[in-house]
Amino acid sequence: MKMKTSNIIFSIVIVLLITVLMTGRSTIGSLLSGNVHFPEEYVNNVLTMEDGQRFTVFRRLMVDGNKEGQGTPAIFKVRFRFKNFNIGVNKRLSIIPAPFLIGMEGFLEKDWTINEATNEFQGIYQWSSTEAAEKYPNSFIFELMTKRAAPGTVTYEIMPNTDLSAYLSAISNK
């Protein structure tokens, strides 16, 4: 198992390096300019979703000044179960796509959440427009995530004209 884990982690690091090279200029520019933040607001808050499931926010990422393709904001939500590793390992590995997200046109924010009762992970993203949100399921990083998900567990939805801050405030149980 240790060899398998190290092979997977090595593969992920290679993919990360390729991704940074692909999105390098905008990612590095955002990082160096101080536009990338990991705010604590909502971290450890429990969110009660529309289907009644409860997810806890364990990480947030925000990018200022990434408003290309502006329109009305949209939320992209994805939910799935990982097929390998325990919750702790997957929480740590879940940061790997961050450099790619930072470089994506229209990406503004991601909240990582988990339902520990069902072992489901959920990502809640803010995009600058519905068009930007609609591109995400066709991205390399989304494809990588779905390959790590247990078969048949990936679901997603796009919520046009929705501001993530207002949405989180409405569903947060603190």
What are these regions (language model features)?
Residues E68, F100, T113-I114, T146-R148:
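Generic marker of residues within folded, mature protein domains
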Residues F100, M104, S139-L144:
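Conserved short hydrophobic interaction patches
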Residues V20, A74-F80, E109-F140:
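Short, well-ordered beta-strand segments in beta-rich or mixed alpha/beta enzyme
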Residues E134, M145-T146:
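Exported/periplasmic cell-wall-interacting domains
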Residues K4-L108, M159-K174:
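Short S/T/G/P-rich N-terminal loop/turn motif that feeds into the first structured element of a domain
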Residues T146-P160:
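Conserved short beta-strand edge segments in small beta-sheet-based binding/regulatory domains
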